[in-house]
Swiss-Prot record:
Pfam families: DUF402 (PF04167). InterPro entries: DUF402 (IPR007295), FomD-like_sf (IPR035930), Ntdp-like (IPR050212), SA1684 (IPR016882). The active site is at R23 (proton donor). Mg(2+) 1 binds at N87, D103, D107. Belongs to the Ntdp family. It comes from Streptococcus thermophilus (strain ATCC BAA-491 / LMD-9). This is Nucleoside triphosphate/diphosphate phosphatase. It catalyses: a ribonucleoside 5'-triphosphate + H2O = a ribonucleoside 5'-diphosphate + phosphate + H(+); a ribonucleoside 5'-diphosphate + H2O = a ribonucleoside 5'-phosphate + phosphate + H(+). The lineage of its organism: Bacteria, Bacillati, Bacillota, Bacilli, Lactobacillales.
């Protein structure tokens, strides 16, 4: 499949391990694609939940997806600084319809002051049993929590202020065309 280009809009679809559609983001603007990664931006983007509820994102957010890492990163640009929401998830696939991944419940939230919280551990344990996550998936996800925390602690990639600034500036340039 042909990769989307800078300025293109794509749909993002999050699934659960059992194949159910979990959440959809419509019209994410692509800022960069490589063989292994997609960087985009959501800004007042329509989100549809599995139960049909809809909402619109409140602030601009740089989104980062990678084909080798079992997480994706959302850098939310707020008045008090950058906050992050990181989903432990399968590496993405991209087809004609959307960028797609499996959401594995565990999330890491990083507040603007740098505080980190691991979220939804109970939900993960319940779904691990209900949806029969394999021991391999359990191991991979726990290892990728460690990798993610290392990225956070070392300001790697999306956790660097300059990274967010560069991609937000590029978004503003594209938006004003």
């Amino acid at each position: 499949m042909k990769l989307p280009k800078e300025g293109d809009f794509i749909t993002i679809q999050s699934y659960k391990h059992d194949g159910r559609l979990h959440r959809t983001w419509r019209d994410t603007m692509v800022l960069k694609t490589t063989e292994n990664a997609v960087i985009g931006v959501n800004d007042h983007t329509l989100v549809t939940e599995a139960d049909g509820r809809r909402w619109v994102t409140r602030e601009p957010a740089i989104v980062y997806f990678h084909k080798k890492y079992w997480f994706n990163i959302i850098a939310m640009i707020r008045d008090n600084g950058i906050s992050y929401y990181c989903n432990l998830a399968s590496p993405y696939v991209l087809d004609q319809e959307a960028l797609k991944y499996i959401d594995y419940d565990l999330d890491v939230k990083v507040f603007a002051d740098g505080e980190k919280k691991l979220l939804d551990v109970d939900e993960y344990e319940i779904h691990k049993k209900e949806m029969h996550y394999s021991p391999d998936i359990d191991y991979i996800l726990k290892e990728h929590v460690k990798i993610l925390v290392d990225w956070i602690n070392n300001g790697k990639g999306p956790f660097s202020q300059s990274y967010v600034n560069i991609w937000y500036k590029r978004y503003l340039e594209l938006r004003s065309r």
